Amino acid sequence: DTGPQGPQGVAGPPGIDGAKGDKGECFYPPPPTCPTCPAGPPGAPGPQGAPGAPGAPGLPGPAGPQGPKGDKGLPGNDGQPGAPGAPGYDGAKGDKGDTGAPGPQGPKGDQGPKGDQGYKGDAGLPGQPGQTGAPGKDGQDGAKGDKGDQGPAGTPGAPGKDGAQGPAGPAGPAGPAGPVGPTGPQGPQGPKGDVGPQGPQGAPGSNGAVVYIRWGNNVCPAGETNVYSGHIVESSNANDANGDYLCLPDTHNAYPPQTQNPLLNLKDVTDSYGKTVPCVACLASGRSTVFTFPDNTVCPYGWTTEYVGYEAANPKWPGQNLCVDTYFGDKLSQTPCNNLAVIAKGPLNAYSYQPQDVVSCVVCSI
């Protein structure tokens, strides 16, 4: 059993520095046969020895078990302040003792010389708490010791909090196409889009041209091409034709003789004096349409006047009406005995025409 604590002894003189310990052996890296060397078991605690006289610091032994708390001893007499000793090795932290009675403060001792930096030794057994000495100056930092063996794995810590959400990963590859779903109902019609920009101008088109017959003249207007000139002919029998007129060229082509009776016999159209009526085929470039406006002598706005004349027809049977140029229309009469006669105006419901008035006409192109 542990005896009662004795009175505190007087402070002994400072001990001398211990000899430098041998450098510990460290297996690093571990041998190939030992990927991770486990820590060895702790040594058995040694028995607590009787307090001996202060001697030179011995080699530190393993830490013994903590003994039971002893009875509170009587405060000892204050010892003479000792001379400042050289900084010793850090000892293991002892248990907190009872608060002793404050002793009188001793005189400040002289500052001792600065000792050499010693190597850090193993932790010694906790000594008896001595009298508080005058604080010494901080010693120099010791050299960094070699890395010790890895200790046993600690107990798992509590689960940490969820970290902040990381950035989105790259998009994965497209999955296979799913089956075609049923056709949905037609949605409402969207708003009308804006008018698009005007497209580029197209290539210029070719200049058009139109061919027409100028009845009653053998000369085309200025600037137009004379395709051919001739005279007007018609059927000699009202039963053989529909009353249309032809502009037959003055230069006849040679045709082989017919072995059968001809279907249509032609004859010249004459004026009041028995003269043939001329005609000419004209080519008007840059135009595409030719139209005859009856009972008029002026073309509409934007049209070109080809010639002005009189409306004429065959008085013997109904058929084609011609706009005969005024150059030759003055030579036609209104008598029905002629092959071609001008058309006179008769009384109309909406207008008051005189019987002697003729119907004018104008041929226009655009």
UniProtKB/Swiss-Prot annotation:
Biased composition (Basic and acidic residues): 138-149
Localization in the cell: Secreted, Extracellular space, Extracellular matrix
Keyword field contains Secreted: yes
Region Disordered, annotated ranges: 1-207
Biased composition (Pro residues): 28-45
Region annotated Triple-helical region, chain positions: 1-23, 40-210
Keyword Protein biosynthesis: no
GO cellular-component term (any): collagen trimer
Pfam families the record matches: Collagen
Organism listed in the record: Ephydatia muelleri
Bias kind Low complexity: ranges: 1-14, 75-90, 99-110, 150-168, 189-201
UniProt keyword annotations, A-Z: Collagen, Extracellular matrix, Hydroxylation, Repeat, Secreted
Protein's name according to its UniProt entry: Short-chain collagen C4
Residue stretches in coiled coil: none
Database matches in PANTHER family: COLLAGEN ALPHA, COLLAGEN TRIPLE HELIX REPEAT
